[in-house]
Amino acid sequence: MSSPQTTTELAAVADALRSHDRFLLITHENPDGDALGSILAAKLMLDALGKNSVMYLSGAAPLPAEYKFMSLDGLRRQLPDDVAERVLFALDCANESRLGEGQAALEPAPVVVNVDHHHDNSRFGDVNLVVADASSTGEIVRDLVRELGLALTPELAEALYVALVTDTGRFQYANTTPKALRLAAELVETGADVHRVFQSVYETVQLAKLKLLARALDRAQVYEGGGLVVSYLLKTDFAEVGAAEPYSEGIIDFLRAVEGAELAALIREPPAPGRPARRVSLRSSSDELDVSAIARASGDGGGHRQAAGFSSELEIPQIVDFLREQYLQARAVARA
């Protein structure tokens, strides 16, 4: 985070946080560890500044069970009545659509602050801090804490550690930079409980989630000589095994681990009524294959080079055809 643009943006966000008193913290629907860790860390950061802030999450899906150990009791599922009086502070949201029902707060909010690490971020904020080479949004929040002259606390460190460890895949993904590892050491030294985080996030598995995983693995198919692995989950699967949509998180990592796979895709039908009809998660095993470009080609998606997703109204066979075509194009670009 040493580029002149990043330094300028960091200072601008810090100034916006200092100069306002009331905030609405928001992250993307179907949140992952980076989203939840970042929003909690931002809440603790604003508390330390003496600010009034509330956390909000769009959608009706329950929080993933693995994150219930976090201090998220104050997380609201309905927008507060005083939205027009609060700065909208968006974290880990690549674009407005990722806010879900929270998009309704964009217009009345006096100021929109956008902090994110997705390289295709639409920069929808009045004040933007987008650092594409950051390992996680949590890493950027740590730099904000430093810019504001605040000290790390064990609670803040643990929230940031959750963001960091999950978005780097337990420090295995290509975004595990030297800075990310130095940050991990700092957070542990400050008091982040590594064992508690590991047990909660990675060893808390509901039986329904295992049954959902079994169905996805049973349906997995390989295409294009084994370079593309695709599976799917139906709305009825969630109902029959008693699973909520967040239970599907992490399944795609098993698909990506298939020998020879360059691109993995999990198509799922959200169990809740309404749109979209289907969501698709994408993962690549190499930084050479940009899955965010595939997600954008769908017309309703985006993300990182190695982890992205999109929504679709197409039927599953049509989505598979789209993925096969896009995979071949992406592979040709990568090998050109």
Feature annotation, model-predicted:
Residues S2-E29, G37-A65, A84-E85, T166-S298, ...:
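Hydrophobic helix-and-loop "lid/oligomerization" segment in the mid-to-C-terminal part
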Residues A16-L17, P80-V83, A104-E107, N121-S122, ...:
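Solvent-exposed alpha-helices and their adjacent loops that cap or buttress functional pockets
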Residues N30-P31, C93-E96, H118-D120, K235-T236, ...:
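Short glycine-rich anion-binding loops that position phosphate/pyrophosphate groups of nucleotides
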Residues V115-A184:
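Short alpha-helices
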